[in-house]
């Protein structure tokens, strides 16, 4: 598997970095920049957008991400995915302002084009 194999759109679900393990879902889009680094764009629920840049090696994808809250606070963190296949990513993450005793968890499943499903 190469970094190029990870480019695409994924359905995500996970739980937050809190004791309640509150759940979330959304979409993750992975693309490459001119240096073959991963560019990530998450759409969480209906109204939260997060972005990040990362790198891939030996089936591990690491992305430094950030987003802005409704109150204007910038949150930063890192997510680490184990690339089980080019279609399934299993990850965990942490934010600098999150509960230090907890980790967030996220799974990503590639969204296939209809024509891919028929072949």
Which positions does each model-derived feature cover?
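Central antiparallel beta-sheet cores of small beta-barrel/beta-sandwich binding domains
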Residues: 1-119
């Amino acid at each position: 598997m190469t970094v190029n194999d990870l480019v695409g759109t994924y359905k995500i679900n996970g739980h937050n970095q809190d004791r309640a393990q509150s759940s979330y879902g959304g979409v993750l889009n992975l693309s490459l920049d001119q240096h073959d680094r991963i560019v990530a764009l998450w759409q969480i629920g209906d109204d939260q957008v997060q972005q990040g840049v990362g790198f891939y090696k030996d089936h591990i994808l690491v992305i430094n991400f950030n987003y802005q809250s409704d109150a204007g606070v910038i949150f930063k963190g890192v997510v680490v995915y184990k690339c089980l296949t080019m279609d399934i990513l299993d990850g965990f993450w942490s934010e600098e302002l999150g509960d230090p005793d907890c980790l967030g968890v996220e799974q990503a499943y590639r969204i296939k084009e209809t024509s891919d499903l028929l072949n």
